[in-house]
Amino acid sequence: MKQNVASKGTLSAGRMRLRAAACAGLTAAVCFAGCVPAEAKVTQIVIDQRESPTYAGAAFGTVGQYEKFIGRAFGEIDPNDRRNAIIQDIQLAPRNANGKVAYVATFTLVKPLDMTKGNNILLYQVVNRGNRGQAFNIGGDPGDGFVQNGGYTLLWSGWQGDVALRPNHANETVQVPVAKNPDGSPVTGPVIFRFANEPAGTHTISLAVPPPGGFTGVVYQPLSLDTTKATLEKHAAESTTAVTGGVVPVPSNAWAWADCSVVPFPGTPDPTKICLKDGFDPSFLYQIVYTAKDPLVLGVGLAATRDVVSFFRHATQDDAGTANPVANHLSYVIGHGTSQSGNLLKTMIHLGFNEDEQGRIVFQGANPYIAARQTPTNFRFALPGGAATLFEPGSEPVLWWQDWPDKVRGRARAGMLDRCRDTDTCPKIVETFGATEFWDLRMSPGLVGTDAKHDIPLPHNVRRFYFPGTTHGGGAGGFPTATTPPSACTLQSNPNPEIDTQRALFVALTDWVVEGKRPPHSRYPRLDEGLLVRPTKAAMGFPTVPGLPFSDNFENPVLDYDLGPKFIYNDMSGIISNEPPTVQQVITTLVPRVNADGNEIGGVPSVQHQAPLGTYLGWNVMAAGFFKGQICAFTGGFVPFAKSAVDRVASHDPRPSLEERYGTQDGYNCAVRLAAKGAVAQRMLLQADADRLIPQAAASNVLPTTGSASDNRTAALLCSLERLSDQHGDHDSDDGDED
């Protein structure tokens, strides 16, 4: 039986469809009748699989069913085109018979079965380490069908050339060339590889061990298997600022480029593995620096993304006559990226890849989400899949949208929009991020520069929204009074969600792109409001809570590396010659202030943050292993409030208990309704999501339905405030005024 996923009015395909449809035919007619064909482009698409309908036949509101196309895009780029010249080692990439540099990118396209019922908008979701995601749906893909109900066409494609394609097209990748010297000899350079917490008894480790994100990367192989030409050492201790202790060199005769899992040391030679004669010690971190060969020209992935998106947006067919399945039906493209893939969106815009080879804009709208840095992909021997660990580039380039000087690092004044301004191809940008981006992903310089002395102004085409008290990507939501600690971390898991606010802001971005309707004002912590401070207990005003560890300067710092004279810092391009790099200085970073509960102030608080059940943290503490006591990677913590005043006093907790805050369950329900109504009025929450959250809170059993006389009075006061807000309309709509 056909499943129907009902539309709740969260996105309206119809209200944008007529306007977009009127533009679609005109755009295609003008382009294909009058434009000169691009020299560099997608030349062929191959559809390997078509599933029609997809999603098990589910229908989505007025849009109906969807279908899916899985395939490959064959493309070529002109290495001499100014738009491609910035790609590192493009001149060392092999050429095809046309003198171009070729690539093959996988893609997945999902579209309404009847495109006339869609909204004519392509939502391009940048894959994260090759993995497809569904950013705005609750419950996966299709989950609650949020974007499908809106009529969006969805596209994912490969951009990261060191990701292996998994069976059954489980992910996306791109085949890019290997750089070679003009005489055919291998291009070489230094590479660093670091690993820790290897189980006792381990003798062999693979350099293709899945990095964060769970993908299998391509290994940069050593030029020589002679271990005297590499340096392996182990560290007994290491700080986040690269201060090491107990550094012990591993003799060259005590390890091998080999696999010892079957044959004992020195094992079977293998350039992708390291064998240690006496085995790895889990109490040490190991670091190897070696001369590698055959770097991938990973910057080609930027051009491939640009070209694939442009093909589906503009082309009617490929050079072989294969039809574009969405030809003449798309008028707008919005790009979204989460974390690493959001960083890639920033890199694309910064390096000029939001202009295609015909001078057209690629993304009219962009939502870099929880993306504090840029993606390290356009330099020799880059490793794009890293995760802001020590010695990994990512915060070296321009991190701010507006032109701004970087006096601390001695860099030229620049901004991420410089190139797109020159070509009139800047998108409308809604940047969204949460607390962990400050604490663990080095967000601060993007707001206040490297000297941390001034708020950097935002350009007119950029809005910025901060989600206080959230973990990386947001928590599971709901209204829990206790959670389970994440793996490897000390504190309970932070449930504070981001998805509800993200959905509302995605609608605002869509309206901005399609209708020109201004989004709400930017909302994020600023210096001039006193909401950004040094990460110390005193500066933040952080309370003393029993069982809650807090150390001053606990954040993952921004380090100023000396990567060598051939590295182009502002563009994070070029060649690294120093591995490991010298740390020249530690950049001042700031974090948000907190209130007496330890909850962050400013930004766009979720409903849960406005009706808190505890302290929601953007950081957590590593529970064990080599990094015990340091920040637990990309993970926020949660410290619940005591349920009653008696419990609070017994535990010496200075934070008011749930009963003291809300009185009864009715009081809590009123607090949630008050927060939800205000967020809807401010366009920070969709009515459909408010209608979901309010009964969810009512069913949460946070408190008893009745209490003491004092509890009942507290609840009655909260409910009277809610009624008062309804009568007086205290929550004004925020239409923004930054244009």
Protein language model features and the residues they cover:
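C-terminal His-loop and adjacent cap/lid subdomain of alpha/beta-hydrolase
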Residues: 41-739
